[in-house]
Amino acid sequence: MPRQSAARLHRVISAERRTAEACFGAFEFARDVAKLLRVMPPSPHPLRFTRAEFAGAFGDLGTDLPLLVGIVVATGMDATTAFVVFGALQIASGLAYRLPMPVQPLKAMAAIAIAGKLAPPLLAAGGLIVGVVMLILARSGALEWIARTVPKPVVRGIQVGLGLQLAMLALTRFMPADGARGWLLAAVALVIILALRTSHRVPAALVVLALGLVAAALTWPAGAPLPLGVRLPTLPARWPTPNEFAQAALLLALPQLALSLGNSVLATKQVVADLFPEREPLSVKRIGTTYAFMNLLAAPLGGIPVCHGSGGIAGHYAFGARTGASGIIYGTFLVLSGLLLVGEPAAFQRLFPGPILGTLLLVEAITVLLLVRDLRDTPAWLAFAVACGLGAAFLPYGYAVVLLGGTVISAALRRRTRQTVPI
């Protein structure tokens, strides 16, 4: 018996040592990536690890977790690697920007990959292609030209479209989960958020997440094991073939780039200016460059394609995040989740009930939608932005249509009415 106990103790210590080494490696990787992403001088703004930052860190969980788990389950890619790389990029973004600058799954690619159950190398090829294209646009100055050409009402319209899509996702997919019980849980979570929206002592998001964990514990299937253990990341089995690169260019990269230009670059720059007017303005060149480097790093390591996003900033901000500490906290959570994630990834998702994720997502959607209010002094352009938002949300390739068509129409309207579009 003593010999067996010693063997068990040795196995536990070995597992803990491997976990600690993997965590240290992930943080070293994140620090190196942050140095690479910091294409401007270091920010003087400090990181604040407060309760509000901890709460705001999970403000984008309702968007990220379903897409991340959905991609892993549909494509069969290694869950540990996907979570660890995704978390390390969150940490790197927080260190580089010193803002709650989110790292999110590429939404158009995620939807196509989940629907088509694409192979991981095809998804990696798509991430590499958008990374190369965005890097060329950023470093050539093309992004600055696009930013000067696309007027503010079109950018606001893209945000309205994103807000509508996020709200519909929350209301039609996540909140109705578990039927009437799910709606009740979502209603309780929403009441908590409204009641604590101005509280700095008790952050609403942390209370809502705790509520979700309690609900998950009460409804956990009898006899079902917890998806916990220790696993280490692995590198992809193979590199994409030339044929997969060609497929990915048409199937994945083309639909994604229009959405990325509108939401990940232009709208993100605008939201940072809206929510952090006291901070130095971000350039589209910097945002595009970090977008590119993240994908060029993630794909070879077995991570999912990623981007920045205006909705993610709004979600983190709505729940209290004001510095890059929120990204470091969130990234640490994701890295640890990846290292401790075993078995079916969908089981891990059960720890965060759909109605809870839906409530967080709905708050994020409302925050994004309310950004259009700054056009209320020009009713014509407000109506134009709302029309652009409806087109972005409901038309096929809506973001590309609005980005191109909205810019052309707004230019024609300005010439005809001699009005200046607010910038």
Predicted regions: what is each one?
Residues 55-117:
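Transmembrane helix-boundary motif of multi-pass solute transporters/channels
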Residues 62-68, 102-109, 265-267, 303-312, ...:
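Transmembrane helix boundary and interhelical junction motifs in multipass membrane proteins
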